[in-house]
Regions:
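Conserved beta-strand-loop-alpha-helix junction that forms the acyl-donor binding cleft
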Residues: 114-122, 128-139, 157-161
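Acetyl-CoA-dependent GNAT
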Residues: 11-12, 19-73, 79-80, 84
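Conserved acyl-donor/pantetheine-binding loop and adjacent beta-alpha core of acyl/acetyltransferases
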Residues: 61, 67-76, 113, 118-122, ...
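Residue-level recognition of the GNAT/N-acetyltransferase active site
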Residues: 10, 84, 88, 133
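Conserved acetyl-CoA-binding loop-helix of GNAT-fold acetyltransferases
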Residues: 83, 89-102, 106, 113, ...
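A short beta-loop-alpha structural element at the N-terminal edge
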Residues: 3-17
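Conserved acetyl-CoA-binding loop of GNAT-fold acetyltransferases
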Residues: 143-153
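Short, high-confidence coil segments that cap the C-terminus of an alpha-helix
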Residues: 45, 109, 122-125
Length: 161
């Protein structure tokens, strides 16, 4: 799709993100997305949208962290990705993912080591993580096609309600 434009997500994209999510999951989660999109300045994250002729057809949200769980590096996380079902399997997700990787390679977090002049050493992301439900084979196939493989960590949970 040659006419797809990838750009940064803005507050004005909230309605489009909510609508795409509703098409995928069958229910509206406006408050959920409002927190993620409108309050991203509280927890900054790279976020992109794909659009055709001004219409948002997909989005991807990530964030950068590090040093958690014994990981000695800057880690890029893919928080979520969504593509309008009408445009799925047309390379939109791959375009969004590829652009997010470029952002991750440029970004990083302040790492513990410092340079000789005492300034924090900033490095780009070296590894990307995401979480996928075992019943989402479509997403697992997508991430596999993007080069992901099973990582060294295991998701644990304890139900409290």
């Amino acid at each position: 799709m040659d006419n797809v434009k990838i750009r940064g997500l803005s507050d004005t994209d909230l309605d489009s993100v909510v609508e795409i999510d509703k098409k995928i999951f069958g229910k509206e989660r406006r408050e959920f997305w409002k927190r993620k999109v409108l309050y991203s300045d509280i927890y900054p994250r790279p976020a992109l949208v794909a659009e055709i002729d001004g219409k948002v057809i997909g989005f991807i949200l990530g964030f950068v962290s590090g040093w958690e769980f014994g990981v000695p590096d800057s880690v890029g996380w893919i928080d979520t990705i969504g593509v309008d079902p009408e445009y799925q399997r047309k390379g939109i997700g791959k375009l969004l993912f590829t652009e997010l990787i470029k952002v991750f390679k440029k970004s990083g977090i302040e790492k513990m080591p410092q340079t000789k002049d005492g300034k924090p050493k900033i490095e780009g992301v070296n590894v990307i993580y995401t979480l996928v439900s075992w019943d989402r084979w479509d997403l697992m196939q997508f991430y596999h096609a993007m080069g992901f493989k099973k990582g060294d960590m295991l998701n644990l949970e304890q139900k409290i309600r």
